[in-house]
């Protein structure tokens, strides 16, 4: 696409060592993307620390809310990041930040890259190792019917999916959910 290097992680759940670990990559990546579930529990302390951390990035940061971030007003009030509902073009690539439980995914139909917490249903990124599908049926339907322009979906939610990457109707899906390991799981995506 445009010679950009993207960092993608999800489901950090306020992992103690994750924040400094990720910040150390600032010079290695052009854009940082996080697909929700920043919080472990709904506490003012966690929200404050995450907000400070997100504000400390020197590169563009895109985020979407996850089920543990509800209500997401705290996340969406951080001025220096692109959050829920945002559509922003950088170097000709249109990013869209889909809120958790989005009412109308078609608002993001023209985006090249979508950040969404829940992966499309019936993909190896949405099916857990115990064979339960936790994916978004509507998102999968829109992709299958070519109603979204997106070429890349950045998601999480499923901590141990069958696979962290899949392709549905030509759309690359990256599930970068961390599973509580000492170091956060992340994916490096070259555009």
What are the residue ranges of the model-derived segments?
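Core catalytic region of metal-dependent phosphoesterases/phosphodiesterases
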Residues: 9-90
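Binuclear metal-dependent phosphoesterase catalytic core
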Residues: 2-3, 87-92, 140-146, 160-191
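Catalytic core of the metallo-beta-lactamase
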Residues: 13-17, 95-108, 138
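Short, conserved loop/helix-junction motifs that constitute active-site signature segments
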Residues: 53-58, 108-109, 143-149, 167-169
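Short loop/helix-cap segments at secondary-structure boundaries that form the rim of catalytic
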Residues: 72-78, 90-91, 104-109, 163-169
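Active-site-proximal segments of metal-dependent phosphoesterases and phosphodiesterases across multiple
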Residues: 39, 44, 112-149
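Active-site neighborhood of phospho(di)ester-bond hydrolases with catalytic His/Asp-centered motifs
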Residues: 7-11, 32-37, 61-67, 82-84, ...
């Amino acid at each position: 696409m445009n010679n950009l290097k993207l960092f993608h992680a999800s489901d950090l759940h306020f992992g103690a060592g994750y924040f400094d670990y990720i910040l150390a990559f600032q010079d290695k990546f052009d854009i940082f993307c996080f697909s929700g579930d920043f919080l472990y529990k709904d506490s003012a302390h966690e929200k404050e620390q995450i907000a400070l951390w997100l504000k400390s990035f020197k590169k563009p940061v895109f985020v979407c809310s996850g089920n543990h971030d509800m209500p997401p007003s705290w996340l969406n009030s951080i001025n220096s990041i692109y959050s829920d509902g945002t559509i922003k073009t950088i170097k000709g690539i249109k990013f869209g930040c889909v809120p958790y439980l989005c009412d109308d995914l078609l608002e993001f139909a023209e985006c090249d890259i979508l950040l969404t917490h829940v992966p499309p249903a019936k993909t190896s990124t949405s099916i857990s190792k115990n064979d339960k599908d936790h994916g978004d049926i509507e998102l999968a339907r829109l992709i299958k019917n070519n109603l979204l322009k997106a070429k890349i979906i950045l998601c999480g939610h499923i901590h141990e999916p069958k696979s962290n990457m899949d392709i549905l109707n030509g759309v690359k899906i990256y599930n970068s959910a961390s599973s509580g390991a000492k170091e956060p799981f992340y994916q490096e995506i070259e555009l």
